[in-house]
Amino acid sequence: MVRLALVVAEFNYDITSLMLQKAIEHARFLGAEVTYVVKVPGVYDIPMVLKDVVAKSDVDAVATLGAVIQGATKHDELVAQQAARKILDIAVEVDKPITLGIIGHGANRMQALERVEEYARRAVEAAVKLARRKKLLKDAKYSGATVYVE
């Protein structure tokens, strides 16, 4: 069973609380166990806790959830791009799956609400699949025939 942590931004919590509910439901559907739900103030703050979360021995993968709503300036673009870049950097550094379930940039509130389920499910599904496949790859042995890890 994959042990999954969810890191959720509280900013735009009317949206991210729904994402959290959908993520937990989908994790259960996939047979994963949600071991931690960690709330942070905003999407930009997600990278601040990731190393602590992935260091937990009872976490195989992390799905990040958040919503960056378009405003009058380019602030949403900056927040979403920098958070995504740092999340990927940390995932590669720690060698554990950390997936991106962040709506935005450029999304308005209505678009974000329409994308709640899709983004939450995709982030959880990718995290669970990656964790399972990393384990399969680690345990795989080549014996003269191509090894497929799927």
Curated annotation (Swiss-Prot):
One of its GO terms (cellular component) is riboflavin synthase complex. It holds the Pfam family DMRL_synthase. Keywords: Riboflavin biosynthesis, Transferase. The active site is at H75. Catalyzes the formation of 6,7-dimethyl-8-ribityllumazine by condensation of 5-amino-6-(D-ribitylamino)uracil with 3,4-dihydroxy-2-butanone 4-phosphate. This is the penultimate step in the biosynthesis of riboflavin. 5-amino-6-(D-ribitylamino)uracil binds at F11, V43, Y44, D45, A67, V68, I69, L100. GO terms for biological process: riboflavin biosynthetic process. One of its GO terms (molecular function) is 6,7-dimethyl-8-ribityllumazine synthase activity. It is an enzyme of class 2 (transferase). It comes from Pyrobaculum neutrophilum (strain DSM 2338 / JCM 9278 / NBRC 100436 / V24Sta). Belongs to the DMRL synthase family. The gene is ribH. This is 6,7-dimethyl-8-ribityllumazine synthase.
